[in-house]
């Protein structure tokens, strides 16, 4: 049966939203050491804004969650995808280079995929098959995480909960905390902290004049304060979301700064949710874990992920550390309640992805991940050198895969549009990370080397 014209139009609309990125064909001056001889074409399907639903005459009697109505427009990255798709409709032949969403691009090292393939093949045998695993993660992987990242820090394998990624665990932690808490976030910060807080009913309405939600404490992080908040001016909150190295600014907190943060949490009886997703990018003596700070086990939870180390953005594997020393106000262990949340809401990470995690933590896997991180850090240097040569002030980059570029006095969405329109390069507007991001754009170093070089050329041409 032939498709109707309407159906064809709908299909065209959908395909424009889920089409793979179009990359430049410009080649680097030397071959990529991480690139395989041949690469299969990839189709990236994103969570993008849905087209308006066709009106129907029937409505259920189920009320909408009022908290969903508080959310502002679309989530940041789907909105960027929508604008990118619209740009392609306007310029169908454009070779768009994406330096926007922080998605990895380089192949997962063989030592890691071989471990996953071996586990996957074993599932086809009687002896190798396994069904549901422990919701908290496989004992061997939890032990390996503890030994690799928390040796001598007093963190045990039973404190570690393996997950399908840090972002998912952030929402599970929000379920754990409930709706009757007040949170603080760095400003700017990763949007998932604020949006999950809104969905949980922890916030007031969005205040358009200041671009903030009520009942959230926005801790300003700017070049003027070294991207670390003035804690003396921050009121008490129950939960403090803190990411270091920070997304989007790329700033890594020093040992002295984190010591102040832990003391601040202790003085106020708060819990820190410490996002260490980019810790492996730290190249100086900045702490890679909050638990390097004395007393942190009594006030902190740490989330982490293999996504940006091993290219697991699609594989999905991370972990959260909830120390047994961390207690609620009534003396009940936080870990016991989080374990109940995990057992209720989650059946455990894929056994194949966990096999990949063990591959990551083998000596060969750790070396391979270090090489991948080094590759992206080389990309970061190219981006930094490009903007610096053009006279821009740039921040971050040293300990993170993000470059935070300042466009004083300009609207960050306008800068995003200018770069997309004139250079066909996607960045991320800083205001999408909070009001403190206005006047900045985040440029991601996740990209193939030839695309980073070509993007640098276009940016130099645009702003020369």
UniProtKB/Swiss-Prot annotation:
Cystine residue pairs: none
Gene3D superfamilies for the chain: Aspartate Aminotransferase, domain 1 (3.90.1150.10), Type I PLP-dependent aspartate aminotransferase-like (Major domain) (3.40.640.10)
UniProtKB keywords: Aminotransferase, Chloroplast, Plastid, Pyridoxal phosphate, Transferase, Transit peptide
PTM-bearing positions, type N6-(pyridoxal phosphate)lysine: 308
Compartment list: Plastid, Chloroplast
One of the Pfam families matching this protein, by short name: Aminotran_1_2
InterPro entries: Aminotransferase_I/II_large, DapL/ALD1, PyrdxlP-dep_Trfase, PyrdxlP-dep_Trfase_major, PyrdxlP-dep_Trfase_small
Top-level taxon of the source organism: Eukaryota
Transit peptide limits: 1-39
GO molecular function per UniProt: L,L-diaminopimelate aminotransferase activity; pyridoxal phosphate binding
Keyword Transferase: yes
Enzyme Commission number: 2.6.1.83
Pathway annotation: Amino-acid biosynthesis; L-lysine biosynthesis via DAP pathway; LL-2,6-diaminopimelate from (S)-tetrahydrodipicolinate (aminotransferase route): step 1/1
Enzymatic class: transferase
Binding site for substrate: 102, 135, 167, 190, 247, 347, 442
Reactions catalysed, as given in the entry: (2S,6S)-2,6-diaminopimelate + 2-oxoglutarate = (S)-2,3,4,5-tetrahydrodipicolinate + L-glutamate + H2O + H(+)
Gene Ontology BP term (one): lysine biosynthetic process via diaminopimelate
Keyword Transferase assigned: yes
Binding site for pyridoxal 5'-phosphate: 132, 247, 275, 278, 305, 307, 316
UniProt cofactor(s): pyridoxal 5'-phosphate
Function of the protein: Required for lysine biosynthesis. Catalyzes the direct conversion of tetrahydrodipicolinate to LL-diaminopimelate, a reaction that requires three enzymes in E.coli.
Subunit structure, as described in the record: Homodimer.
Family affiliation: Belongs to the class-I pyridoxal-phosphate-dependent aminotransferase family. LL-diaminopimelate aminotransferase subfamily.
Full protein name: Probable LL-diaminopimelate aminotransferase, chloroplastic
């Amino acid at each position: 049966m032939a498709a109707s014209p309407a159906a064809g139009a709908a299909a065209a609309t959908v395909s424009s939203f889920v089409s793979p990125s179009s990359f430049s064909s410009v080649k680097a001056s030397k071959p990529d050491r991480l690139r395989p001889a041949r690469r299969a074409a990839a189709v990236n399907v994103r969570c993008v804004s849905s087209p308006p639903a066709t009106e129907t005459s029937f409505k259920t009697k189920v009320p909408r969650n009022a908290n969903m109505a508080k959310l502002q427009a679309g989530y940041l990255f789907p909105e960027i995808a929508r604008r990118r798709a619209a740009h392609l409709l306007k310029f169908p032949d454009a070779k768009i280079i994406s330096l926007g969403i922080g998605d990895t691009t380089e192949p997962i090292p063989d030592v890691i995929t071989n471990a996953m393939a071996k586990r996957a093949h074993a599932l086809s045998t009687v002896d190798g098959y396994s069904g549901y695993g422990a919701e908290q993660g496989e004992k061997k992987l939890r032990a390996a995480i503890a030994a690799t990242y928390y040796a001598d820090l007093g963190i045990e394998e039973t404190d570690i909960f393996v997950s399908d990624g840090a972002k998912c665990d952030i929402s599970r932690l929000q379920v754990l905390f409930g709706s009757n808490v007040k949170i603080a976030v760095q400003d700017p910060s990763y949007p998932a902290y604020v949006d999950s807080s809104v969905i949980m009913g922890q916030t007031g309405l969005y205040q358009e004049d200041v671009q903030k939600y009520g009942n959230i404490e926005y801790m300003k992080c700017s070049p003027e304060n070294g991207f670390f908040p003035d804690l003396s001016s921050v009121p008490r909150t129950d939960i403090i979301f803190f990411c270091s190295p920070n997304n989007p600014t790329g700033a890594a907190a020093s040992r002295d700064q984190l010591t102040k943060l832990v003391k601040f949490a202790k003085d106020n009886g708060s819990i820190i949710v410490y996002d260490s997703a980019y810790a492996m990018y730290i190249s100086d003596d900045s702490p890679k874990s909050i638990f390097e700070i004395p007393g942190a086990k009594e006030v902190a939870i740490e989330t982490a992920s293999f996504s940006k180390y091993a290219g697991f953005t699609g594989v999905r594997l991370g972990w959260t550390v909830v120390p047994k020393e961390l207690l609620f106000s009534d003396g009940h262990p936080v870990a016991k309640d989080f374990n109940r949340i995990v057992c209720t809401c989650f059946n455990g990470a894929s056994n194949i992805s966990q096999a990949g995690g063990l591959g990551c933590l083998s000596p060969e896997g750790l070396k391979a991940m270090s090489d991948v991180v080094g590759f992206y850090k080389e990309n970061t240097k190219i981006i930094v050198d490009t903007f610096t040569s053009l006279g821009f002030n740039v921040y971050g980059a040293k300990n993170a895969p993000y470059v935070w570029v300042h466009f004083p006095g300009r609207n960050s969405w306008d800068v995003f549009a200018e770069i997309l329109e004139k250079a066909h390069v996607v960045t991320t507007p800083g205001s999408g990370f909070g009001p403190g991001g206005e006047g900045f754009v985040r440029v991601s170093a996740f990209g193939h080397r030839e695309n980073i070089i070509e993007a640098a050329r276009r940016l130099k041409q645009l702003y020369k």
